[in-house]
Amino acid sequence: MQTRKVYLYVFHTMSDWEYGYLIAELNSGRYFKQDAASLKVVTVGVNKEMITTLGGLSIKPDISLDECTLGSQDLIILPGGNTWGEDIHQPILKKVGDALKLGTTIAAICGATLGLANEGYLNSRKHTSNDLDYMNMVCPNYKGETFYEKGPAVSDENLVTASGIAPLEFAVEVLKKLDVFAPDTLRSWYKLNKTQKPEYFFELMNTINR
């Protein structure tokens, strides 16, 4: 089997909080089940020029889109941001369209779901976003209203979508899709981060120290 790769698409105005839970766990592997291979998060940009996130962080992409080849075992994370309606994202959206057919896992949150919607990629797949009415208003090519589900995050085959205020649920759906956490580990990890109750930390530790 081809080695699984994880890509984080980076661009000006990307929303820092939306991918934090997810990439921290994927890159560290600290709660992975014993037979799960380690992963490295690779940042990919339209080009290799430095970008600035919404929070003011400067990120120099590891690779450009031209250097990024998405395989069926790979994951690409598409964060939200203020620019998804702009032409600069057309190259990644084209690549994502091909990758969806190939079986690559596509994880899109917040504004990135609008980019997918306007390309017609959500017209026949279960999905969610920040708001259906807003999606209908800003995405003229979107015809997937019957597949829209109200909820923080939705998974359908190789596609995960989420609201921008649900980064934790977004992470859970992607981690579940990749099958890198044992089910009880994922459940305890979610409860700890969702409730902030210390008993779930000890429950989490017990799931990985057996």
Swiss-Prot record:
Keyword annotations from UniProtKB, A to Z: Hydrolase, Protease
Family: Belongs to the peptidase C56 family.
Gene designation per UniProt: yoaZ
Stretches assigned to the PfpI endopeptidase domain: 4-180
Highest taxon above the source species: Bacteria
EC id: 3.2.-.-
Classification via Gene3D superfamilies: 3.40.50.880
Protein name: Uncharacterized protease YoaZ
MF terms in GO: peptidase activity
Any one GO BP annotation for this protein: proteolysis
GO cellular component: cytoplasm
PANTHER family assigned to the protein according to its UniProt record, in alphabetical order: DJ-1_PFPI DOMAIN-CONTAINING PROTEIN, PROTEIN/NUCLEIC ACID DEGLYCASE DJ-1-RELATED
Active site: 110 (nucleophile)
First-tier enzyme category under EC: hydrolase
InterPro entries, A to Z: Class_I_gatase-like, DJ-1/PfpI, Prot/Nucl_acid_deglycase
